[in-house]
Amino acid sequence: MENKYSIILGNLGNTCDRFCKSYKTNPSSERMLELAAENMPYIGGVELVGTWDIRPDNAKEMKKRLDGYGLECASIIPDTFGDSDYGKGSVSSIDPAVRRKALDYLRSMCEVALQVDCRIVNLWMAQDGYDYLLTADYDREREWMTEAIRALASEFPSLKIALEYKPKEPRNFSYHARMADTILAAQETGCRNVGVTIDTGHGFVGGENVAESIVLAKRAGDRLFHMHFNDNHGCWDDDMIVSSVHMTTYIEMMFWLRKTGYDGWLSMDQYPYREDAIGAISESLHWIKKYETIVDERYDEIERLIGLNLSLIHISEPTRQ
């Protein structure tokens, strides 16, 4: 099976944290696009972050550059996380003016997506959540989110609205935290073009088995719209190189992506703070490509082992011969 590979363009740029504002120089989006096209193996697309890479005023120019490099816009990620106006929530803010601003901004990014022939708008609603107990009306704020996402999906029926979940950061508790609550959020809109993005690292932090999450999205009505790949140690969203921690986990993921018929993008989403970005992201691409090959070559064997429910015993057999 030949999968579609992409990267988040901004991962080639500056990285920072709350202790250090800049670990690297930050190339322009145009330069990062050039670097991606010239250096990244296997990719056929890039993801663009709103305000970082793409806006209404540069959409036509960015589309021209993408076409020139033979790349697609795999998804657009609206920036509802880096604007201080959204620090206490975007479409879930208790301030109706902030909610209107956020929804209008999301509408503008959907328009941009259409301009660059992008079919996925990836919503990582990072500021929509809470930090302290007894400070949030969970029911009302979730309903505001549902209303906004429903409006967006209804107004742009040709786009897939993919909800990316993450347990925490920058808020201590996120409303889209894990597969189960995010699938519920998608279903509550009543719109078939609302689904889920799985970020492998977010799943690890949330204690999920990502392969099972893939199946849950399938069972919910083919709601898996997009995939982000990275790795971590299970306690924080470290955004490390794929397979620096997990291995069998990725083989199982790739198996279930194939078995469930997923045909979307496999996108690398890393934060190489101190590593060479081109090298780190390329390594992740090579790892995922290798796992794709393993699954292609051993698909029937893996399926048989799962069916027997004795995979650990059978995997160990070759070492005894």
Model regions and ranges:
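A contiguous, mid-protein "functional segment" used to position or interact
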Residues: T260-L310
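Active-site acidic/histidine proton-transfer and metal-coordination neighborhood
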Residues: G68, C73, D85-G195
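Hydrophobic faces of well-ordered beta-strands that scaffold small-molecule active sites
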Residues: N3-L9, G44-L48, C73-P78, V121-L123, ...
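Gly/Pro-rich active-site loop or hairpin
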Residues: G13-P27, S93, A136, N172-I183, ...
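Structural motif
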Residues: N39-P41, V116, F156, T260
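Active-site-proximal loop/turn and secondary-structure-junction residues that shape catalytic pockets
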Residues: N11-G13, G50-W52, D79-G82, M125-G129, ...
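Generic structural signal for well-ordered alpha-helices
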Residues: E30-A37, A59-K63, L106-C110, M145-A153, ...
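N-terminal pre-domain/capping segments
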Residues: M1-S108, L114, K289-S316, R320
